[in-house]
Amino acid sequence: MFFKSMGATATDHAALAPYTEALSPGQVETIFQRALKNQASPQDVRQFNGHMQLEMARMSTEDGLVMQLHPGSLRNHNLEVFARFGPDKGFDIPTATEYTRNLQPLLQAYGRHPRLALILFTLDETTYSRELAPLAGVYPALKLGPPWWFFDSLNGMHRYFEQVMETAGLYNTAGFNDDTRAFASIPARHDVWRRLSANWLAGLVARHILDMAEAHAMAADMACGLARGAYRLDQ
């Protein structure tokens, strides 16, 4: 509760894979003791990380902090650059990412919990329509984050609208957030998102799927309302 008392509204979790697994207290303690002795195996690490993702979701049901999950980046791909200059020098590369099975333990436990808000991101666009949109359509706790990192672009946003919205529905997405450390880019990024949102909505109006009043209301939500709701800023 300390972070919430200081104004935090969300947590953010990075993982190579969105793997989750429920372990018993005895299993957790055994792995932890092996880790303290520097004897943990790769399988121990995978299981412990998966269990901790479940624990993070559980804690979010208690403190109400929105849980964000950003998986699928293989960090420091070029080992020579990493050795010479250290981490985070531009060699973080997307990987193929599986969500349906990896997240099943977490979603079985908390996917319908009224106090969990889980926002998922991806660097694997092939999962938009195959996995993420269907998952967001059935688990009330789950929303899809906006196009992230390499896809935070004109074409990336266009693909997102085409692949996500039909199955997930607009209101199972989290709008657009300021997921960047490059603060000077924030106005430009929001400008691109709002223009692409308007373009997508205009296409729906032109095909008589929406009327103008509906499109105007949805445009306001895509610009601001969805994000405020997803991150519980008005609560």
Model-inferred region functions:
Residues 1-6, 50, 58-63, 206, ...:
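Extended recognition/assembly regions associated with phosphoester-bond processing machinery
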Residues 21-23, 77-86, 128-136, 154-162, ...:
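Histidine/acidic-residue-rich catalytic or RNA/ligand-binding cores of hydrolases
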Residues 124-126, 144-162, 210-233:
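C-terminal helical cap
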